[in-house]
Structure formats: structure tokens, C-alpha cells
């Protein structure tokens, strides 16, 4: 029986492989830790990060003690969408990074989807 970490890594690599086929668009990547949630817009062809937002940003950090919750994920999604809009990015590929599309990942994606298209 495989460990949970091994299953997660396999799921993450499978998702990244599928996303790498659409190289003409930038990637909205999500990372969750125990306390925080991070979102980055990455251009893989140039290997640069175009925009980033997380619960460590000063605007969002002030809101609550627990940072990795749905309310703050919505704020991170709105912030990354605002930064993408100012950078002129309208179309991205959503990289959920091996996480289930549920809870904070879904909340962040729905909030970002209001200004960016995936």
C-alpha cells in the first residue's frame, strides 16, 4: 500500500505533465501549508514568476489568526486576480498542485475566476 505522500507526489506530477502540454499559457499554481495558502502566476517558458499572493501579505495577514481558511483563500484569489489583471494576463491554466478541488483550493479558484479565465 502506498503512503499518502507518495500518492500526492504522483498526483502532482500527473497534473503538471498535463499542464505542460499547454505551454502557450501561463500557470496559476497553488501551494498549501498548514498555516498559509500561496498562489503564483508562473510563465514556464521563461521560468519566471509574474505575480504572487499569499496569506502572508499584509492586507490579508491582519484578518484572522488562522490563515488557511476559505475566507482568506477568497482574499488571496481576489489579490492574485488583481495582480494578473495589472500585468495584462487574461488567460491561465489552473495548477491545483495535487490538492483536491475542494475547500480552500476551490474558494481561491472561484475568486480568481472572476477576473481571469481558466
UniProtKB/Swiss-Prot annotation:
Signal peptide: none annotated. Pfam families: Ribosomal_L18p. Keywords: Ribonucleoprotein, Ribosomal protein, RNA-binding, rRNA-binding. One of its GO terms (molecular function) is 5S rRNA binding. GO terms for cellular component: cytosolic large ribosomal subunit. Gene3D superfamilies: 3.30.420.100. GO terms for biological process: translation. The keyword Magnesium does not apply. PANTHER family: 39S RIBOSOMAL PROTEIN L18, MITOCHONDRIAL, LARGE RIBOSOMAL SUBUNIT PROTEIN UL18M. Belongs to the universal ribosomal protein uL18 family. This is one of the proteins that bind and probably mediate the attachment of the 5S RNA into the large ribosomal subunit, where it forms part of the central protuberance. Part of the 50S ribosomal subunit; part of the 5S rRNA/L5/L18/L25 subcomplex. Contacts the 5S and 23S rRNAs. This is Large ribosomal subunit protein uL18. The gene is rplR.
Amino acid at each position: 500500500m502506498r503512503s499518502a505522500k507518495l500518492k500526492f507526489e504522483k498526483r502532482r506530477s500527473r497534473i503538471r505533465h498535463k499542464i505542460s502540454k499547454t505551454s502557450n499559457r501561463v500557470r496559476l499554481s497553488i501551494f498549501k501549508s498548514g498555516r498559509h495558502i500561496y498562489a503564483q502566476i508562473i510563465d514556464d517558458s521563461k521560468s519566471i514568476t509574474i505575480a504572487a499572493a499569499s496569506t502572508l501579505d499584509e492586507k490579508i495577514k491582519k484578518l484572522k489568526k488562522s490563515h488557511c481558511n476559505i475566507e482568506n483563500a477568497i482574499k488571496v484569489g481576489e489579490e492574485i486576480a488583481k495582480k494578473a489583471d495589472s500585468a495584462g494576463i487574461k488567460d491561465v491554466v489552473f495548477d491545483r498542485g495535487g490538492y483536491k478541488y475542494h475547500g480552500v483550493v476551490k474558494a481561491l479558484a472561484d475568486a480568481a475566476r472572476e477576473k481571469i479565465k481558466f
